[in-house]
Structures are given as C-alpha cells and as structure tokens.
C-alpha cells in the first residue's frame, strides 16, 4: 500500500503550452482517486507520468517517501490496466495473468497460487485455459484486472478501462471494480471521461480541464458545491442549467422573470458586492420542480414556460424549455401527461441555487 504525492507537476511537449500545468495532489493510502475531464485535458498524460511511461518535465512525484521521477516503470511497484486490455492473443487466460510474474522469475508454485486466487476473485476459474478470442469484452477486462492483481503492487492505475464495453457491461464492471477495491484496499488512480463513473466509484474526484485541476473533492462535494461553471456543467447528467441574470433587490432577474433569492444567499451576495450586478445563476434539473410539488416557499420562484421537448424516461420526464432566450432542462415526475407545445408551471428551489462571477465563472461563496 502507498501514499502518492504529486508536487507542482508540469508536462510540456513543446515550450508553448503545458499539457499538464502545476498539478498538485496528495493521494492517501487505500484511496480510489478518479481523474475526470474531457478529451485532451491531461488526465491520461498525468497517469502515464505516474506510471513512468512519460517523463515529468518539471516537479516531483513521490511514492511514500521515495522520489520516483527517475525510477524505471518496472521498479515503481505499479500495475496498470489499459483501455484495450493489452492481452496476448496466442496465450491462455492463465498465461496472460501469469505473464508478469514469469518475467520476474517467480517460483511456479507461487505463480499458480496467485493466478488461481485472482481467477477465483474475478470469476475466471473456468476460463483459465481459454484464449482471449473466446472471451466476451467483460471477461477480457477481468483478465486485464487479474494481471494487475497478481502483481500485488502498491498502486493500481486504470486508464479508461471500461470505455470499450457496452452500457450494460460498464455498469456491471463498475460494481466489480468497486468491490475489488473494497477487498484489496490498494491505492488506485482511475482515469475516465465519464462523470457517472467518477461519481459512483471515487473516494475523491480530480476534475481537469486544459491540463489544470479545476476541483478536488468527494463526489458529493464536487456535485453539490462546484468550484466553477465548468465543473457544474461537466459533473452531473443532465448538466447543470446556467442563466445570465442580474441581481436586483432580493431576486435574480432573468429576462422578464424574477426569481426570489433566499435572504441568507442574498445577504452573502450583497456582502461580496454583487448587488445590482450581472452574475451566472446555476441550478440542477432535479431542483426545478413541477406544479404538483410546488410548496409555499417556491411561490416566488415559479414561472410558466412553454415545453419545447418532453422526453419520457420511465419514472421521470426531461422537459426542455426556456426563459427568454436561455434554454433549461427540468427533471420532473412522470405523473404528468405533458407534450411539446404545452405550457407547464415550474418552480426553482432557490435554496439549491448556485451563483458564479460573470467574468471569472468562479463560484461566489461566503
């Protein structure tokens, strides 16, 4: 097991722009850390620097108390699981899992013991003598996980391991990886562009954009208290709604609509000097309620809007509408029989409102 420290890490491929820019992170022993962000944000590059597959341009990387910048990948005691499984097609499942142990010239009885234990853990015992082409995508990914497990490494690195699987298998494998971590308690860094994977799997999430960390926090913290507009829009599905508006006396004015702001939030905004100024107002789709559950405290934050699109998703309906020229999505109860072109009264739960500076897009906080 191990703690990891990444201190002021930079990666340049040329001298113009950093692919990874001043990355700072302390990973505690047994944590499951997820790097999440859009393509090209630097998450896989950071993971490859941890693995030793990319050189660190500047900064220090420690495993425990040992600085490992110049230590070869094979000597870092790290096991990596790749997106494309990286299995040898001519080898059996047993030999694929055992391959790294054989390279280290481990005694055959110990190899057999480790492979069989990993296979039992991953439900692969009956497939040990098959070759990868005879396995499903999920089974191949389990083999790749097994190869990492038998290493008994200090750290597991996983680079988009589920992206080649279909939706149903991804859900199943997410649960299996979580259970595996709970059992092994190995410090893990997991890279994904899928915010659902980040929210469901992580001890802490590291949200990245353009090579920079945007926010580090628990899934709950990142979801409920996004540091900026990017994080609010990237984490959560559907994404947070954003409106450009002006703070007036006790309300946010969005076009012709005025939504009452709770006194506590309004007091904080006044103290920060935002009274009478333009701000960005954010609210999640589940915090916009339909008229069936509008309570007294929401009366001053309700509007009647035309439905542009209504998507029935079983127990809920995604309603696409707009205030003035600004679109929004509301997630409402499927008890409504509603259709595009109709009008619906919805209320905004302003206790769940988020306010961001209109220029910096950073969250306004007390």
Stretches found by the model and what they are:
Residues 36-38:
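The feature captures the beta-strand-to-loop junction immediately N-terminal to the Walker
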Residues 5, 26, 62, 246, ...:
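ABC ATPase nucleotide-binding domain
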């Amino acid at each position: 097991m191990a703690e990891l420290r990444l201190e002021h890490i930079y990666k340049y491929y040329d001298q113009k722009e950093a692919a990874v820019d001043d990355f700072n992170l302390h990973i505690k022993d047994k944590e499951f850390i997820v790097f999440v962000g859009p393509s090209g944000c630097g998450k896989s590059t950071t993971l490859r620097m941890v693995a030793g597959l990319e050189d660190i341009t500047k900064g220090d990387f420690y495993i425990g108390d040992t600085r490992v910048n110049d230590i070869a990948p094979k000597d870092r005691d790290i096991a990596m699981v790749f997106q494309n499984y990286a299995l040898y097609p001519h080898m059996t499942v047993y030999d694929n899992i055992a391959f790294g142990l054989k390279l280290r010239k481990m005694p055959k009885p110990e190899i057999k013991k480790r492979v069989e234990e990993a296979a039992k853990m991953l439900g692969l015992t009956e497939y040990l003598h098959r070759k990868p082409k005879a396995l499903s995508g999920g089974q191949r990914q389990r083999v790749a996980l097994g190869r990492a497990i038998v290493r008994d490494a200090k750290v597991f690195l996983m680079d988009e391991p589920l992206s080649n699987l279909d939706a149903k298998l991804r859900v199943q494998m997410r649960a299996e990886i979580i259970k595996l971590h709970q059992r092994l308690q190995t410090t893990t860094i997991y890279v994904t562009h899928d915010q659902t994977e980040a929210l469901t799997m992580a001890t802490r999430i590291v949200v990245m954009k353009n090579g920079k960390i945007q926010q580090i926090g628990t899934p709950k913290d990142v979801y409920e208290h996004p540091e900026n507009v990017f994080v609010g829009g990237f984490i959560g599905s559907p994404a947070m709604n954003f409106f450009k508006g002006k703070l007036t006396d006790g309300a946010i004015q969005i076009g012709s609509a005025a939504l009452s702001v709770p006194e506590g939030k309004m007091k904080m905004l006044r103290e920060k000097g935002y009274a009478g100024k333009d701000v960005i107002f954010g609210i999640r789709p589940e915090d916009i309620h339909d008229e069936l559950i509008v309570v007294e405290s929401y009366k001053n934050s309700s509007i009647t809007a035309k439905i542009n699109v209504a998507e029935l998703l079983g127990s809920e309906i995604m309603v696409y509408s707009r205030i003035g020229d600004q679109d929004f999505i509301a997630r409402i109860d499927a008890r409504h029989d509603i259709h595009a072109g109709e009008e619906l009264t919805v209320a905004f739960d302003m206790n769940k409102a988020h306010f961001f500076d209109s220029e910096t897009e950073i969250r306004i906080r007390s």
